[in-house]
């Protein structure tokens, strides 16, 4: 485990008053080396915080007294302090495999870490999820989480993930929901693989097995010019239209049974099918906006508000001129 490094000390904060500086390494908080920023935040919420930091090879002990729940005033270099749980799936549609060579190393990191799902909305397949992970999520109420489903058929799912554990790892999804952890799902549609009848089966079984899912975003596979999987292709207009019909059908069933639509199609499917975007209310709370679902409708709604008279320019501008250093070339 590497020690997290301080990137910023907020002026006027408890950390600044204690003498912490940029570059200090965080060795322990209240006698514990936190494994991630989640555990760190829980530890520093206490009114009395004991820190051990490493500076120039020397360990320094600091006692800090602050208001309970008040921020300590540090920004650290990473959210995960022990080790990111990497992905051992080999999905043929994985976007990491479709990146060009020669880019920065961090872009090639395939994570399958529930902590990054909680912190940033990353999708996890749960193929590396464990009993210990479940216990922590339940105890600390770490939600919402985001889970890649793709298909409920074990053979189809394990084939898409190219991992035999893909056939069984959705048991963790059921366990999370049974403990009332909020979970959003995702289905990446690959033509002839998990669309058509497989998609209909997946939607039907989700309603039966996982009715507590907060939402299920359904997005088409994305391919770059660096894709090496010759069996993959994007949707035709007819395929996109057929998948939208399936999604809309199961939306109606979900609304009848659960009082909410549950299933939501990406903007790209509507564009590919040549169909208009649904009305605002069809997206309910825009729970998968960052997954490309409802962005176009939200944009149109914003334009409508502007056309109805919302001023484009602020009525008054105050402040002072400042110079900003240019970014390095």
Where are these regions (language model features)?
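Conserved Radical SAM active-site core
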Residues: 57-59, 66-212, 220-250
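Short alpha-helix capping/helix-loop boundary micro-motifs
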Residues: 10-15, 35-37
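Terminal peptide-recognition signature
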Residues: 15, 23-26, 51, 94
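Conserved PDZ fold ligand-binding element
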Residues: 17-35
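Short, compositionally biased
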Residues: 38-52, 67-69
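Short, Lys/Arg- and Gly-enriched loop/turn segments at beta-strand edges
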Residues: 32-40, 60-62
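Hard-cation-handling environments
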Residues: 244-329
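PDZ/PDZ-like groove recognition
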Residues: 1-10
């Amino acid at each position: 485990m590497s020690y997290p490094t301080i990137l910023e000390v907020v002026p006027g904060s408890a950390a600044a008053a204690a003498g912490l500086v940029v570059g200090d390494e965080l060795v322990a908080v209240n006698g514990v080396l936190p494994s991630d920023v989640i555990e760190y935040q829980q530890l520093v919420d206490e009114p009395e915080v004991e820190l051990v930091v490493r500076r120039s090879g020397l360990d320094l002990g600091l006692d800090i007294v602050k208001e309970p729940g008040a921020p300590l005033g540090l920004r650290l270099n990473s959210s995960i302090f022990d080790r990111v749980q990497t992905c051992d799936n080999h999905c043929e549609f994985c976007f990491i495999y479709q990146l060009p060579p020669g880019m920065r190393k961090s872009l090639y990191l395939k994570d399958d870490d529930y902590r990054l799902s909680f912190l940033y909305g990353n999708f996890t397949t749960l193929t590396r999820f464990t009993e210990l992970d479940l216990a922590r999520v339940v105890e600390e109420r770490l939600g919402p989480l985001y889970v890649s489903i793709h298909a409920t058929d074990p053979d189809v799912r394990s084939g898409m993930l190219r991992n035999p554990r893909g056939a069984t790892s959705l048991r963790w999804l059921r366990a999370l929901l049974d403990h009332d952890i909020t979970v959003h799902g995702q289905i990446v549609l690959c033509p002839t693989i998990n669309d058509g009848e497989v998609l209909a089966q997946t939607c039907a079984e989700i309603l039966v097995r996982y009715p507590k899912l907060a939402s299920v975003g359904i997005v088409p596979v994305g391919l770059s010019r660096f894709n090496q999987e010759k069996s993959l292709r994007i949707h035709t207009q007819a395929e996109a239209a057929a998948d939208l019909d399936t999604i809309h059908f199961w939306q109606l069933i979900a609304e009848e049974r659960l009082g909410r639509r549950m299933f939501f199609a990406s903007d790209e499917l509507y564009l590919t099918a040549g169909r208009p975007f649904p009305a605002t209310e069809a997206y309910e709370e825009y729970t998968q906006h960052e997954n490309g679902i409802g962005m176009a409708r939200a944009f149109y709604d914003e334009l409508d508000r502007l056309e109805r008279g919302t001023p484009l320019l602020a009525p008054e501008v105050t402040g002072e001129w400042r110079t900003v250093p240019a970014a390095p070339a």
